[in-house]
């Protein structure tokens, strides 16, 4: 059998609640308490630069408080006064409703119960008999008040001529630029060495662009008395992140697109890139995902499913009364007593070369992405229910490690990046899957990381958060603890696993592999194998 090229990771980039992925800054923010003073200062300086602060020297607490999961900030929306239109029915009851209005604001189709009388060239009087319904703009308290947000003050659209791009696409441009800058090689030189059709780009968004500059604006414009612009529809497409990378960052002309698999979408795209490198269809592959779901409409959809941790439920978990403040930093509690996940925004990117190109150009090799396994759940009673697919992907991933590294390295040199959303169902099903997989392969004390406790759940980009953070763990020799929890829930299976609320140090030389697990809604299970 002919030798296949090995897909190696030569760069990473991205932005999420912990800061920049490049330079492993984001991982350092998550493990901040375990850093030495020099590392802490470097982390603070990186974040201060993003946040537009002149100096980090006297801003430590401000920087820490305005990163990771926290109360939703007003640049997204006001959680204490969410705008909505309340139905406002009226009855004249013998006393007609009467008001003056500018002629230009009259509806095109005058209701039959309206009597309209001209009062001037520009104004009319409206007299309404009987029943009439209005929509009254008002506001209300939002049930969910926490999200994983980009560092306060960091506005990706201000860093390039964004021209009213949706936030997810602005984040995409910044993430791709971050990865390109972190590559350490001149992109023009790479383009001269690699044929144009040998550069693949796979990046997307699980939900598309749903903020007011994308599909969100398109769907609600007329309802709110505004017009639909020509940008709303095309910029909302789910594969648009790859299009933006090709057009605005790389000028790439190779294979492109996005494969969507709910929360596993980043890994689906990584699978595409690995396949292209292995087959020789590409020598370079940019892999990414971007999600910007922190708006009231999207969050209300997840809240209606019972998926998000609400302030009321967090109060009940912590035994707080209505006058006591909820710690929004602890909203996401994987594998503990919990009540839902915490939504987040993120854009993550990795760059793959084939191993020969990496050696030829002298690229830094951060690790190898050897496999991504995808399996559906099969028949099940509910589309949201768990199934057998993730058992299969986990088993295949660990078997792949054993085939490449051998039995001893598989048992002693790895870690698992859990999906770890913070929902009651996930803590039971995923801990069962991880435990049974470890048991089947003879692994004891398998370290489990659950980074959504810091970052929140960025949907299609979530497994990208896991991948880039894993590279940071190998660099720093640090697994951030699940520090939002007091104890594991009683229904969490712990056999053969090592959960920890505390940060754990290890010698980076001992790192052999990581298994990245993702359980996408609907049965989109994906597990990736990464080698150090």
Which residue stretches match the model-derived regions?
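Flexible, low-complexity linker/loop segments at domain and module junctions
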Residues: 1-9, 190-196, 408-410, 441, ...
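A glycine- and small-residue-enriched flexible loop/hinge segment at structural boundaries
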Residues: 6-19, 31-189, 206-218, 237-255
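Conserved small-residue
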Residues: 176, 201, 266, 273, ...
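Condensing-enzyme catalytic core mediating Claisen C-C bond formation in acyl metabolism
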Residues: 3-17, 313-407, 414-415
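Conserved catalytic cysteine-centered active-site region
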Residues: 48, 123-170, 208-272, 305, ...
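Active-site-proximal alpha-helical scaffold in enzymes
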Residues: 171-185, 238, 242, 249, ...
């Amino acid at each position: 059998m002919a030798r296949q090229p090995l897909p190696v990771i030569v760069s990473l980039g991205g932005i999420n609640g912990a800061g920049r992925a490049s330079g492993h800054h984001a991982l350092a923010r998550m493990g901040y308490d375990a850093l030495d003073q020099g590392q802490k200062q470097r982390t603070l300086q990186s974040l201060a630069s993003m946040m537009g602060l002149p100096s980090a020297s006297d801003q430590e607490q401000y920087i820490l408080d305005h990163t990771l999961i926290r109360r939703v900030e007003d640049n997204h929306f006001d959680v204490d006064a969410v705008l909505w239109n309340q139905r406002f029915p009226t009855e004249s009851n013998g006393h007609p409703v009467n008001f003056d209005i500018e002629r230009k604001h009259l509806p095109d189709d005058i209701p039959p119960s309206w009597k309209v009388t001209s009062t001037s060239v520009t104004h009319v009087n409206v007299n309404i008999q009987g029943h009439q319904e209005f929509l009254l703009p008002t506001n209300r308290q939002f049930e969910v008040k926490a999200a994983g947000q980009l560092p306060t003050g960091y506005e990706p659209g201000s860093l390039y001529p964004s021209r009213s791009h949706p936030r997810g696409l602005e984040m995409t441009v910044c993430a791709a630029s971050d990865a390109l800058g972190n590559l350490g090689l001149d992109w023009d030189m790479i383009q001269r060495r690699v044929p144009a059709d040998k550069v693949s780009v796979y990046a997307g968004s699980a939900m598309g662009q749903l903020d007011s500059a994308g599909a969100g604006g398109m769907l609600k414009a007329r309802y709110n008395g505004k017009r639909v612009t020509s940008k709303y529809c095309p910029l909302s497409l789910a594969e648009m992140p790859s299009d933006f990378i090709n057009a605005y960052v790389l000028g790439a002309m190779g294979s492109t697109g996005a494969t969507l698999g709910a929360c596993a979408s980043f890994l689906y795209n990584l699978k595409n890139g690995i396949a292209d490198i292995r087959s020789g269809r590409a020598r370079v592959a940019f892999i990414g995902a971007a999600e910007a779901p922190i708006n009231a409409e999207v969050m209300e959809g997840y809240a209606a499913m019972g998926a998000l941790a609400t302030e009321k439920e967090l109060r009940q978990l912590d035994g707080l009364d209505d006058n006591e403040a909820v710690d929004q930093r602890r909203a996401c509690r994987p594998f503990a007593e919990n009540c839902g996940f915490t939504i987040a925004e993120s854009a993550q990117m990795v760059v793959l070369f084939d191993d020969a190109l990496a050696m030829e150009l002298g690229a830094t090799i951060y690790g190898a992405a050897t496999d991504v396994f995808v399996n559906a759940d099969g028949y099940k009673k509910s589309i949201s229910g768990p199934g057998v697919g993730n058992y299969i992907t986990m088993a295949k991933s660990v078997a792949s490690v054993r085939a490449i590294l051998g039995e001893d390295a598989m048992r002693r040199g790895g870690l698992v990046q859990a999906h770890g959303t913070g929902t009651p169902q996930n803590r039971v099903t995923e801990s069962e899957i991880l435990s049974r997989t470890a048991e089947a392969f003879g692994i004891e004390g398998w370290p489990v990381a659950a980074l959504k406790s810091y970052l929140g759940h960025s949907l299609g980009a979530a497994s990208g958060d896991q991948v880039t953070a894993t590279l940071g763990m190998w660099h720093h020799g640090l697994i951030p603890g699940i520090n939002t929890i007091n104890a594991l829930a009683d229904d969490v299976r712990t056999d053969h696993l090592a959960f920890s609320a505390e940060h754990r140090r290890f010698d980076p030389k001992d790192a052999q592999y990581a298994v990245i697990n993702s359980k996408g809604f609907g049965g989109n299970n994906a597990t990736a194998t990464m080698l150090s």
